């Protein structure tokens, strides 16, 4: 399980897919991979937008390249990178304390923009 350390959440996700197989994710198509790589290259060359950004990643991330995320966020003047200790890829499907911190940080970002 590369998604979450929360066993109950993972069991719930598995039950959802068993009950509704159409919700399951398959592998990407070659067309999707090609388009994604093209977009990633374009975004890597572009400067960070002049906007606030919150990026929350799990410390144990094994799906996306955490080093690339760290590098991008280091170049984002209004960006904030939070690494959640012990978390996997899906921080909003993690244990309650991780999920709550992530949602609180997002709400604080939105509140700051509304002020």
Where are these regions (language model features)?
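Short beta-strand/loop motif that positions the catalytic acidic residue
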Residues: 49, 55-57, 61
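Glycine-/small-residue-rich active-site loops that bind phosphorylated ligands and cofactors
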Residues: 24, 61, 98
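Catalytic active-site module of serine/aspartate enzymes centered on a nucleophile-bearing elbow/loop
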Residues: 79-115
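Alpha-helical elements of Rossmann-like donor-binding domains used by nucleotide-donor carbohydrate transfer enzymes
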Residues: 31, 35, 71, 101, ...
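Short alpha-helix in the alpha/beta-hydrolase fold that links the catalytic acid
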Residues: 51, 65-74
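Alpha/beta-hydrolase
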Residues: 1-52
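Nucleotide-sugar-dependent glycosyltransferase donor-binding/catalytic pocket residues
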Residues: 62-65, 92
């Amino acid at each position: 399980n590369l998604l979450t350390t929360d066993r109950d959440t993972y069991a719930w996700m598995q039950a959802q897919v068993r009950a509704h197989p159409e919700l399951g994710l398959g592998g990407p198509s070659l067309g999707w991979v090609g388009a994604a790589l093209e977009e990633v290259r374009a975004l890597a060359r572009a400067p960070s937008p002049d906007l606030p950004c919150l990026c929350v990643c799990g410390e144990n991330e094994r799906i996306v390249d955490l080093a690339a995320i760290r590098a991008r966020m280091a170049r984002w003047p209004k960006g904030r990178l939070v690494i959640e200790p012990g978390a996997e890829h899906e921080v909003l499907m993690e244990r309650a304390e991780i999920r709550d911190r992530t949602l609180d940080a997002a709400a604080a970002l939105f509140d700051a923009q509304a002020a």
